Swiss-Prot record:
Gene name for this UniProt entry: adk
Description of its domains: Consists of three domains, a large central CORE domain and two small peripheral domains, NMPbind and LID, which undergo movements during catalysis. The LID domain closes over the site of phosphoryl transfer upon ATP binding. Assembling and dissambling the active center during each catalytic cycle provides an effective means to prevent ATP hydrolysis. Some bacteria have evolved a zinc-coordinating structure that stabilizes the LID domain.
Protein name: Adenylate kinase
NCBIfam families: adk (TIGR01351), PRK00279.1-2 (NF001380), PRK00279.1-3 (NF001381)
Protein residues bound to ATP: G10, A11, G12, K13, G14, T15, R127, L199
Keywords: ATP-binding, Cytoplasm, Kinase, Metal-binding, Nucleotide biosynthesis, Nucleotide-binding, Transferase, Zinc
Region named LID: 126-163
GO biological process: AMP salvage
GO CC annotation, single: cytoplasm
Cell compartment(s), UniProt: Cytoplasm
Organism: Pelobacter propionicus (strain DSM 2379 / NBRC 103807 / OttBd1)
Presence of keyword Iron: no
Any one Gene Ontology molecular-function term assigned to this protein's record: zinc ion binding
Region (NMP): 30-59
């Protein structure tokens, strides 16, 4: 079962990807993790990527696609995988089709977690982090006992720069520009399934299970 998972920042994509991993026994694969692993393991492509990143450049599609191809050919992907954060462009999506074809595979499901911009802003703008011990809080969903103060070490909590409303708006705009063409691409192929990401976690998981297992509406 080969799955691609889309979702804007704050949609809970990581949580749902982990659910797919645990339920179906397939690895979660992200381009960030793949790049870091390739660099750490000093693979030929990893060394090229490190040289570019150290110089402050953007890693080319050629290198990224090579790393993706290497990762998808690993033994643990034999029964499937869930791709997180890839592809990001139509050329990458087209190249992924070729990579999978060379491995005798194809994309089986493309899931898009749909959450309104207002809800995303509410989720992200409420996040707070302790700069001392690293613990995370949320002003609405997991508030500290004393406002603005870490429960564990007493340090003042901070808000990440990219969790400010202006930054969130920019991130959502970038996401929309990236994924709208991809959604159309996969919808045309009959692979795209939208899942309501504003529901409680368990209900989102049930929707994803229905998609991946082909369950009817009464699947429990």
């Amino acid at each position: 079962m080969n799955v691609i998972l889309f979702g804007p920042p704050g949609a809970g994509k990581g949580t749902q990807a982990q659910y797919v991993v645990e339920r179906f026994g397939i690895p979660q694969i992200s381009t960030g993790d793949m790049l870091r692993a390739a660099v750490k393991n000093c693979t030929p492509l990893g060394l090229k990527a490190k040289e570019i990143m150290d110089a402050g450049g953007l890693v080319s599609d050629e290198i990224v696609l090579g790393i993706v191809a290497d990762r998808l050919s690993c033994e643990d992907c034999g029964t499937g995988f869930v791709l997180d954060g890839f592809p990001r462009t139509i050329p990458q999506a087209e190249a992924l089709i070729e990579i999978l074809a060379c491995l005798g595979k194809q994309t089986d499901h493309v899931i898009s977690l749909e959450v309104s911009n207002d809800e995303i802003t509410r989720r992200l703008s409420g996040r707070r982090t302790c700069p001392s011990c690293g613990k995370g809080f949320h002003v609405l969903f997991a508030p500290p006992r004393k406002a603005g103060v870490c429960d564990f070490c007493g340090a003042d909590l901070v808000q990440r720069g990219d969790d400010h409303p202006e930054s969130i708006c920019n991130r959502l705009s970038v996401y929309e520009k990236q994924t709208s063409p991809l959604k159309a691409f996969y919808a045309q192929k009959g692979l795209l399934r939208a899942v309501d990401g504003s529901l409680p976690v368990e209900q989102i998981q049930l929707q994803i299970r229905k998609v991946l297992e082909g369950c009817s509406s009464d699947c429990a």
